[in-house]
Amino acid sequence: MSEDKYCLVTGGAGYIGSHTVVELCEAGYKCIVVDNLSNSSYESVARMELLTGQEIKFAKIDLCELEPLNKLFDDYKIDSVLHFAGLKAVGESTQIPLTYYFNNIVGTINLLECMKSHDVKKLVFSSSATVYGDATRFENMIPIPETCPTGPTNPYGKTKLTIEDMMRDLHFSDKSFSFAILRYFNPIGAHPSGVIGEDPLGIPNNLLPFMAQVAIGRRPKLYVFGDDYDSVDGTPIRDYIHVVDLAKGHLAALKYLEKYAGTCREWNLGTGHGTTVLQMYRAFCDAIGFNFEYVVTARRDGDVLNLTAKCDRATNELEWKTELDVNKACVDLWKWTQDNPFGYQIKGVDSKFFGDKGDFSSRVVSLGKGTSFEVKLANLGATIVDIVVNGCSVVASLDNETEYKDQSNPFFGATVGPYANRIANGTFEINGKRIQLTVSKEDGNVVHSGINSYHSKKFLGPIVKNPEAHIWTADFKYVDEETEFPARLSTLVRYKVDSEKKTLTVEYESKVAGQGSTGANITNHTYFNLNKFNEATIKGSKVQLIDNTGLEVNNKLLPTGNLKKYTQVATFNDSPTEITEKEPVLDFCFVSGLPAKLDTRSSPLTPVFKLSNEDAKLEVEVATTEPTFQVYTGDYVDVKDKYENRAGICCEPGRYIDAVNNPEWKSSVVLPAGETYGHKLSYTFRTL
């Protein structure tokens, strides 16, 4: 069993659950998300990781299956539970009531059984204002207090009330259990970052996501059900609460249970203010900057005039109140909708497990799938696993995570960092302090960060977006946990795939996580073989460089301080150099002519390397903002039963070799807290 304490969040990949996980993480809790993904997506979990900068453990489990749930409780020290999982559509529940009763109630029974057998005593339950039914049938019950008699009118609400009763009965039998029952009203909005939000599958059941889909062009018009109610504009009044406020309410309830053990109590979560349907329509139109069509139709069965919450109990006891109004919710929802018009479901994107089946932290995500330019990326090392051009793979790649973790892997496609290339004797000085890294037994230096290398680390994410039909982006993030370097780095790797231009752009951005200064030099280590489908090596390909001037190096491949012409390779002004079985042998650092600085992204993306193959009728051009680029002809690439030497050629843009020990270049690789390291590179493929 793990030693760390965890908060288990069932249904944590869903709308309200995901926003609550973010609040929990930001408050210092470690979370495990359990979800069967029947009406949600794992992509929300990947996005939560980047949003919080933390690993969020995930298990795909159906609560109706007791055995895997029980094993999860065996494997982790679970301290508390937030229970969101369940079917939740009111209308659907009237069509398939038995499914709702089985899923929601049996799943909760299993959860409570596991809690009881593992001595887990705290649970925050996601109930609903639907347990009240039509509160207007009573006098003086609007706004609705927790003392209002219950009377749900649909199977969904009845399952919620039944679960509440189960918890009250369990608490009556064992006062060591603590239950916070949260009855909330109408959640709206999205996280202000636009990274997570509501992603309804099919036709939205709720007003705001339906309006958003009309505004973005996915649906023709909005339907308003009735305008003859006794309200200011004739439409029903509801209590709309920003989902971030709602998530913070769950955090407040959990803290209450931690403070007052043995509690079993209900709290309304709402704003206490009513908004009509047309008032909400106008607020949303103000947020998006234009009006869209709506049509008034007949009243909907079961709708009542006013369902507004009385929230005094939550304000007084949980010390919680809403801070975000409906206008802010509309603004945040529109940002989410614009950034993610189809939610988490993105055309041209596919993901598969890369490690053990069911390990969602290790996936390969394909961008541009179904086009003539597809890029496959892995969490491990934020690695470029494959680039497929016109249906053919053009890079050296391996089959799975195990092969990439093997010591024989020559960093194929990996993000190399936190410090690429060589550091002499594995030592350097920052702010008067001498740093010593674990050196290589072969030459006594450190290459590609040695034991600290990113290529074997699991990156969080990715956040995948599709801003244009032919463009996809994927953001990966890694925050150093333990490192021999003097400070931890938080590194963002952003891939951008343009299937029309057949270009892959990579952007790196690093900041110190905390205090101090450290070395930073991050790049990619992809090996190209444009004729891979016909030829096992790069024999027959042709290469050119922007300049064949490079750093002179000693027998340990460390710079002497002089520049040298490497005439065995052609420049852009010459006829390209043809690669044979043995010549040329390249493992040199060439200069691009671009300035060396801490963040080079303001420099122009400059072509520095071209590789072509006439048989494949293909060329790749590497462009960079960096001052140097290392070129390897792969003479020591020998992966048993997979690849032989010269299986690919690598162009690795970066800073000067051993810059951290050179006064002239040191400022370009020493990153202090509060400043930013960055650079860009691109791979563009063209048909000859």
UniProtKB/Swiss-Prot annotation:
GO molecular function: aldose 1-epimerase activity; carbohydrate binding; UDP-glucose 4-epimerase activity
Keyword Isomerase: yes
Obligatory cofactor(s): NAD(+)
Chain sites annotated for binding NAD(+): 6-37
EC numbers, comma separated: 5.1.3.2, 5.1.3.3
Residues the record marks as active site: H525 (for mutarotase activity)
Keywords: Carbohydrate metabolism, Galactose metabolism, Isomerase, Multifunctional enzyme, NAD
GO CC terms, sorted: cytosol
GO terms for biological process, alphabetical: galactose metabolic process
Induction annotation: By galactose.
Region of interest (Mutarotase), residue spans: 347-688
Catalytic activity: UDP-alpha-D-glucose = UDP-alpha-D-galactose; alpha-D-glucose = beta-D-glucose
Enzyme class at the top of the EC tree: isomerase
InterPro entries: Ald1_epimerase_CS, Aldose_1/G6P_1-epimerase, Epimerase_deHydtase, Gal_mutarotase_sf_dom, Galactose_mutarotase-like, GH-type_carb-bd, NAD(P)-bd_dom_sf, UDP_G4E
Region (Galactowaldenase): 1-346
Pathway the protein acts in: Carbohydrate metabolism; galactose metabolism; Carbohydrate metabolism; hexose metabolism
Similarity comment text for this entry: In the N-terminal section; belongs to the NAD(P)-dependent epimerase/dehydratase family. In the C-terminal section; belongs to the aldose epimerase family.
Task performed by this protein: Mutarotase converts alpha-aldose to the beta-anomer. It is active on D-glucose, L-arabinose, D-xylose, D-galactose, maltose and lactose.
NCBIfam families per record: galE
Protein name (database record): Bifunctional protein GAL10
